[in-house]
Regions:
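Hydrophobic transmembrane helical bundles of multi-pass organellar membrane proteins
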Residues: 1-166
């Protein structure tokens, strides 16, 4: 039970931090995420290497760090659960980036993911096509609050921009 609880907490908390403190703000204030993750190459490592921009790796690290920062808190609850959660998070990253035209998530798995509010590759592809949609790295229930956060941050950016010009 502790294994499952710590794995689930790591995924929930990590996805929350990744969505609201990294991913959405990066779409508003940053540039590397959009250039790298929403480009045809889709790789922080490839971008950093090919364009001689090692700082791009820092932004790739932020996505990972959102999950890793919970390790000290959850490790005492269950080390195995933490390791399971980190493995599941990484496997989900790999799975949700299946953008081959021939790939289709099996119908039974789509139903299960919808029931558990888990992002599928098809849903994640919506985000790559339109950066205003389908937020939440792992969990779909973060999408609507993330869209509100996105709008709020854009308004804040606009206000800051006007203040700097004044």
């Amino acid at each position: 039970m502790k294994i499952a609880l710590s794995a689930l907490l790591l995924l929930l908390l990590g996805d929350f931090v990744a969505t609201f403190l990294y991913h959405v703000p990066e779409h508003v204030f940053g540039r590397f995420h959009t250039i790298v993750h929403h480009s045809p190459r889709r790789s922080f490592v490839c971008y950093a290497w090919l364009n001689r921009q090692p700082t791009a790796l820092v932004f790739g690290f932020f996505g990972f760090f959102s999950y890793f920062l919970w390790v000290p808190l959850l490790w005492p609850l269950s080390a195995k659960g933490v390791l399971l959660g980190l493995c599941l998070a990484e496997l989900h990253v790999i799975w949700r980036h299946q953008f081959s035209a021939s790939y289709s998530t099996p119908a039974w798995m789509q139903r299960l993911c919808r029931l558990l509010c888990i992002t599928t590759p098809e849903r994640h592809w919506l985000h790559h096509q339109n950066a205003n949609l389908a937020y939440g790295d792992i969990f779909t229930f973060y999408a609507v609050p993330a869209q509100h956060w996105l709008k709020l941050l854009r308004k804040l950016k606009k206000k800051l921009h006007y203040r700097l010009l004044a």
